[in-house]
């Protein structure tokens, strides 16, 4: 069995900056945009790019993520001899060990990768919102005769210190890499998307773990080693929509941008669809007291209140007299009567009782956590 390029999705992160939203679930399984979860964008990019084989590396609170992905059928990634495989830490003859970094997670799954005998390994993050053609990136990698290609995104100078920054020459060859520099020399931020020539990467990893120089992380260890040894490493500039939703603020902003019909993400593009695995639910129901403006309300919702510039995910209940404004309400949340929710994110399965208030500010978003209960709500 062989495949030209195998995908490996790093989906084991806790997402600590998302606080209460990831207390019981991994960051890639956090709901987004009404009917999606964050990892849907990476899985859909694989399917749309024609990359039909991928491993999904999980670790932190994987139950919800595993249940969501299942066998990959919702993304068309369930072909015989290909498809999606969930990869979790395991016990071997050398003992049981959790993944200690991004590169270590790949090293621990060499047997899985080798079973497909790939020429190229595509490393992906499972927690970004974007659309990208990985085949176009592979074509670039081949044209450059690269050993490593890193997808990069121009960012504002003040934002650059939050990312790994690539400094390149006039041929786009990477000449220097800085991990979250205090004074960045460039604004080309690593997107955490890499294409490696697998035989070369495998050699680097196995040799490092055979000595005391174990490579645990791509940013801290692998990329610097490639540059030190003059491996042909190139930056692939991506200029589409890309959002790192690793903070409450950025997650809220991305959801609000999702409501803009002119959003460059263009979720309605039938030539590059975003797929998901969703429960079959009845259509939304709006009572006579419901008022909706500039919002997205999906299947299973019951609305008796006012919804203004907000997203209601599947199976959300909004009581009479309640006002939801500039907010994102995650699946199965129940909001009682005469409740005010403004500039907020309400987590999955949360309950806000009658007359409650959850009010934030544009730069200080209020959060109700996963399954959190605030007050009591009368049953409709």
UniProtKB/Swiss-Prot annotation:
Keywords: ATP-binding, Carbohydrate metabolism, Glycogen biosynthesis, Glycogen metabolism, Nucleotide-binding, Nucleotidyltransferase, Transferase
Pathway(s): Glycan biosynthesis; glycogen biosynthesis
SUPFAM superfamilies in the record: Nucleotide-diphospho-sugar transferases, Trimeric LpxA-like enzymes
Positions bound to alpha-D-glucose 1-phosphate: 164, 179-180, 190
Family annotation (Gene3D superfamilies): Hexapeptide repeat proteins, Spore Coat Polysaccharide Biosynthesis Protein SpsA, Chain A
InterPro entries, per the entry: ADP-Glc_PPase, ADP_Glu_pyroP_CS, GlgC_bac, GlmU/GlgC-like_hexapep, NTP_transferase_dom, Nucleotide-diphossugar_trans, Trimer_LpxA-like_sf
Protein name: Glucose-1-phosphate adenylyltransferase
Listed EC numbers: 2.7.7.27
Annotated GO MF terms: ATP binding; glucose-1-phosphate adenylyltransferase activity
Catalytic reaction list: alpha-D-glucose 1-phosphate + ATP + H(+) = ADP-alpha-D-glucose + diphosphate
Subunit structure comment from the entry: Homotetramer.
A Pfam family this chain is assigned to: Hexapep_GlmU
Function according to Swiss-Prot or TrEMBL: Involved in the biosynthesis of ADP-glucose, a building block required for the elongation reactions to produce glycogen. Catalyzes the reaction between ATP and alpha-D-glucose 1-phosphate (G1P) to produce pyrophosphate and ADP-Glc.
Organism listed in the record: Lacticaseibacillus paracasei (strain ATCC 334 / BCRC 17002 / CCUG 31169 / CIP 107868 / KCTC 3260 / NRRL B-441)
Keyword Transferase on entry: yes
Family: Belongs to the bacterial/plant glucose-1-phosphate adenylyltransferase family.
One GO term (biological process): glycogen biosynthetic process
